[in-house]
């Protein structure tokens, strides 16, 4: 019995180590640690949770695989309400990244209902943040703002969740971006700077830097736009953040009269889209900001 408990403790320690790597943006290393945990785990609940966590990291890397395919089965089995919530949450994130907003909203609403059934305000707070992101992508900015504001209004904390400060900061950051979309540049920048004071994880800080780059570009403050765009590139590991930073830095450099800088960043962006051979020429000819959704 002692050996069994020791094995469970070891598996959980590995899972926590992988989660810490994910929070730091080290997804590849996290996947390897999740594999180590799965190799040791014999308890079905533990294996299911690790599978969900690994799928989450794979989704962040925009990959698929057996673990990602397992998420729907976790929901169908409904063996553990927390696992149902986490699987639904992961699937809404997957479909949000794929711009399948109908499915993203379906799984987001499922995660929200599960949080309400479990009477877990902190779960509800986090999924409201994600639903706000989906509505934001769907150009339903007013609905997105309501989700973010409702998320911010939830102050309770469950013993199973220790990320209230992080989700609170994310909600403020996303609220700021929505204000930018509404043309309320001063308010939007203020919210994002407020969030930046609370964000400690590289992913969140990189997102805030990208949005500040966008906001200052909208405000025609090209020096600040370039400062925050470069800061985003230093931290960004998610492909979306890297693409957006290069695009915005290219625009800011071009507007500032730095053609060489614009060329560099547009060239870097073009590497992500090899199917579009004339992308750089198009970017020099047309300002695409009004046509680009920076959360995709």
PLM regions and their residue ranges:
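Amphipathic alpha-helical segments of tetratricopeptide repeats
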Residues: 35-39, 72-77, 109-116, 149-160, ...
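Residue signature of alpha-solenoid helical repeat architecture, marking inter-repeat boundaries
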Residues: 8, 45, 82-85, 122, ...
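Single-residue signature of alpha-solenoid repeat helices
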Residues: 30, 67-68, 104, 144, ...
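Residue register of alpha-helical TPR repeats
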Residues: 12, 49, 86-89, 126, ...
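TPR/TPR-like alpha-solenoid signature
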Residues: 8, 15, 52, 89-92, ...
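TPR-repeat structural position
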Residues: 27, 64-65, 101, 121, ...
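Structural motif corresponding to the intra-repeat A-B loop/turn of tetratricopeptide repeats
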Residues: 24, 61-62, 98, 118, ...
